[in-house]
């Protein structure tokens, strides 16, 4: 309890072994990191935990910088780092909202982040299980080097370069609303803990920042890319098994350097209105086996599932404007779904329960009808692997990182449980 106001030229509050906020009102204005724990020789320490209270952080560096884990389980947390998203990513230094080397876990509370750099950044894995998170970023909204699990939190990214990025991404529950100037969700990164640590070490030793995102190229004759963008399936995984996911992207909507799998939930993608990016893009296998998917994008780059097994899907070259009403009906005239697009579009991909590949469906845009046969149209993903199913590596467990094991629900990933309240 109580009130603390701190204004510092460098770091605000620093706990060598750990730092826990259990209540009260804390306001920090710092030239460096606002909250920090940097114990680097004991895996059970070096964490920052926010259990309760009202915490307001304004920092020139990172809002929260934890050497091991950053855990938020309650309270109201507001972070402005590096001048906020409007300032853009700094040319030197780090100005992330929440940064941790091992795990970031959000399992409650209300968190608001306005960051010049990544809003949430883990060099290992992260899990967003409950609570409300609102973020604006000058770079990535939510970024992890290896695994990201979203299994219940309400996550809104209003501004970002890429809204959600990591090697192994699983969304199984919650409400996820993402806006980006490039890819909305990008499965690009490491798929093992060891590879993630190596990537971080290489990045730290390299003074030149490298964009690891695979660029989608305009397709040339024969389905091959014009230019140097890699189409290789490198094993990343983007998996949606539940929840409500909405993506508004100027680059690819859902993009995986490996496989893309949707088996349940409600997924809406507003992709680019023009250019050679698409609503759905994967270098490996793409499948829609359940749930409801509606995706709007340009007709210049249309990728569709690599399999016709399971739930049916249609891809229709239907054109509309921002605000157009799109209705999908079956052969008997029954309405399967009605949607309003936020952007101009030249193609619609749709799938929902009860659709059968080989059957005929109608996609109507403001009353203009286009017929499409389910399971046909567009191009299969995985251009770098012969236009056929790719998919490398096993499926990550539903709700946990694919390689490194499940992070504890609310405790540090490497060490012991942080105290529920300050000791002593």
Predicted regions and their residues:
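A composition-driven surface/loop motif
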Residues: 1-424
